[in-house]
Regions:
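Domain-level signature for soluble enzymes in the chorismate/prephenate branch of the shikimate pathway
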Residues: 2-294
């Protein structure tokens, strides 16, 4: 039998196969993964087919929003979490990863005919857009709008199926304009999204040494003050109107980095140079999902 090397990993001994036997074991595991992937692919396609049949059986001819049922989505997620709890100790994924995967699966199935249109307070790359994707998945069509008023108006007029608006920040308090808008709007609250505000340093450079200036919204700069002082004490700090505008500058200007959420890195094709640089990890923003009916 091939020799095995002992290594320590987080307090426990792990045996690592060496030589040809080790390479064969890795190939065998990869083959098993490939078979699981094929099964997953077939099951995902079967789920999509069944989801489409549900729509047809309901007489789906009109608006897709009528076939998005938040209560059914909650039931699917609850069952997924129950199964995950039962699988503890057997290599189970974390609950938040399970929720994210199932939301993306449901989003893709729902979008087979036409994606849901979700209005949010823009511009693109903001935390509001991150909240859209967290709740509806990346298959939803996120519509960047200029103001909270416009989000309400687009949903009221039927140009967007749902809207996502900020309602409360754990450090800044309530968003009064959102609260005021409910006084005159017929829209209803259809759901809630709690988003941990993770600030990331991003840019096109390969190392922090290449950074000449850092742009971000004043709140984000303030939330990362200590990290910036420790790691980039000599760079210029520039306040921008939004984190998205800062990310755009980081994309277009050599030597410029931005502080923003992960979605901004995706939208503006930036590399995350350092993740989770906020001084307080407990900062969250709560968003409401608004629609014409529950």
């Amino acid at each position: 039998m091939a020799a095995k090397k002992k290594t320590q990993k987080r307090g426990r001994t792990v045996l690592k196969p060496k030589g040809k036997a080790g390479a064969a074991a890795i190939e065998s595991l990869r083959g098993q993964i490939d078979r699981v992937d094929r099964d997953l692919h077939d099951l995902l396609n079967e789920r999509a087919r069944l989801a489409r049949q549900v729509g047809i059986s309901k007489g789906q001819q009109g608006r897709l929003v009528d076939f998005y049922r938040p209560e059914r989505e909650s039931q699917v997620l609850r069952l997924a979490l129950e199964r995950n709890a039962a699988a503890r100790g057997k290599g189970a994924l974390r609950d938040e990863e399970i929720v994210r995967l199932f939301r993306e699966i449901m989003s893709a199935c729902l979008a087979q005919e036409e994606p849901l249109k979700i209005g949010f307070l823009g511009p693109e790359g903001t935390f509001s857009q991150s909240a859209v994707y967290k709740h509806f998945g990346h298959s939803a069509r996120a519509l960047s709008l200029a103001s909270i008023d416009e989000v309400f108006h687009e949903v009221e007029a039927g140009h967007a199926d749902f809207g996502v608006v900020p309602i409360e920040n754990s450090t800044e308090g309530s968003v009064n304009h959102t609260l005021d808008r409910f006084l005159t709007s017929p829209l209803q609250i259809c759901g809630e999204v709690e988003l941990r505000i993770r600030q990331n340093l991003m840019g096109r450079m390969k190392s922090l040494r290449e950074i000449k200036r850092v742009c971000s919204h004043p709140q984000s700069l303030a939330q990362c003050r200590q990290w910036l002082k420790e790691h980039l004490p000599d760079v210029e700090l520039i306040a921008e109107s939004s984190n998205a505008e800062a990310a755009r500058r980081a994309r277009d200007e050599k030597g410029t980095a931005a502080i923003a959420g992960e979605t901004a890195a995706e939208v503006y094709d930036l590399s995350i140079l350092s993740a989770d640089i906020e001084d307080r990890p407990d900062n969250t923003t709560r968003f409401l999902v608004i629609g014409r009916r529950t």
